[in-house]
Amino acid sequence: MRRRFGVKMASMDWLLDLYQRHFDWRDLTLVMLSPVFGIFIAMEAWRFRKTGVFDLWDSFDSMNSGGSYLVTDLILLVVLVLPAMGWVYDHRLFTVEVTPLRFVGLFLFVEFLYYGFHRGSHRIRWFWCAHVVHHGSEKMNFGTALRQSWFYPIAGNWLFYLPAVWLGFEPRWVLFALSLNLGYQFFVHTTWVDRMPAWFEFVFNTPSHHRVHHGRNPRQIDTNFGGTLIIWDRLFGSFVAERDAGKIRYGVTMRQPRSLNPLHLVFGECVSMWRDLWHHKDLRILWKHPDWVGERYPDRAMPEPLPDRAP
């Protein structure tokens, strides 16, 4: 028994060593913001307790996904993401010392890179396999913001931010800017706020803009990808105002999750993608739009039924 316990402890030494060498307070930005998120979720749930904005099982899905995401993301950060970013940083073009003004510039650059990541996550099926978890809820509330996938680091979402590291920004500052970006985005997942002042709506991502992004009707799909800013959508033609979007129904168009099984929520779309790949023998499925396989093989594409949500 002692020997077995010793072997198990020894097998964890490499992970503890990685944490000791890589750990930094910036890694815990979203963890430190979690109490704030919890307060706002509780306030919103109480405010809309009789309106159907919150659903018990849907909220359970979101909280479960969010908590497990934070844990797995921290592990994969030190095991995979930071070592890879560190290698790129060792081959950087310049060395950029971070000052307050330069950090503002970095934040704006990371926001631009986030737009690329977010747009790619909707239009490339490989990345959609991770991002679909966030869009699986048919509700729009603060809890939905926490609905994230363990699969993100494995799918390679961090690859989109390597240009900032290659230019000379230390990886942790890049990830810190991204964490602040994601922290802001928590507050746009709500129906509590109607519209912000016109100047704010023109520049920043807002609840109004993001409600459109989470819609599944034709006018709402693949729109409003910005994280903190909406200017990239205006520049690149992906912006749709809520007043022009029609009635919004939340969720996804195909394979809407109906299971409480966390493994199904996280990996269900991955299984579907690999099944399509095996069935059609077409590698383009990996990088084409998630709907492409149904358009390319309409006679053979059959959305698979999913189990009903637990009562």
Language-model-detected regions and their locations in the chain:
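Cytosolic-facing loops and C-terminal tails of multi-pass membrane proteins
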Residues: R4, A245-P311
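Alpha-helical membrane-anchoring segments
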Residues: M9-D13, S34, G38, Y69-P83, ...
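Membrane-interface helix termini and inter-helical loops of multi-pass transporters
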Residues: L15-L18, A84-T95
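Short, strongly hydrophobic alpha-helical membrane anchors
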Residues: R2-D27
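Alpha-helical transmembrane segments in multi-pass membrane proteins
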Residues: Q20-F37, W57-D73
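Membrane-interface helix-loop junction between the first two transmembrane segments
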Residues: I41-F60
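Central hydrophobic cores of alpha-helical transmembrane segments in multi-pass inner-membrane proteins
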Residues: P35-W46, V81-M85, F107-L113
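Membrane-embedded catalytic scaffold of the fatty acid hydroxylase/desaturase
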Residues: G67-V79, R92, V96-R249
